[in-house]
Amino acid sequence: MEIPQLDRSNYLKGLLITARKDNQLNETEISIIKKFAARLGFSSDFFEETISHLLENKYITEEPIKFSKPDIAKSFIEDGLKLAISDDKIGDDETNWLIETAQMNGIDKVWVTKKMKEIQNKPHLIGKMDFALFSLI
């Protein structure tokens, strides 16, 4: 599937927002986001600059993101949940923001909750599981 550049940018932005919602970044989160940045076509210099200033960057707004297609939105929500739980806990801020983004894209909260439970039941697989985006591109 061809993913428009705006959706690519929003996908990465959304992952960055999700990662900073708990006011910390760990190595697992950084590694996951780096993989996404590369697959989405962003340079490693851009990634390094963005990630190094992520927590204090006030220019990254945190409004829920609207994607152009439901498949891209569902992929993002699933990957956002995997990223959020990669530090072994998922906070209310992370969950609420992902639910708001899902609802902005016409995705039911029940679907998000079900997907979150599926992922939480397999936390040991987070680093080994395929991310939803990778099946789209």
Which residues are covered by each model-predicted region?
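Small-residue-enriched hydrophobic alpha-helices in membranes
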Residues: 1-137
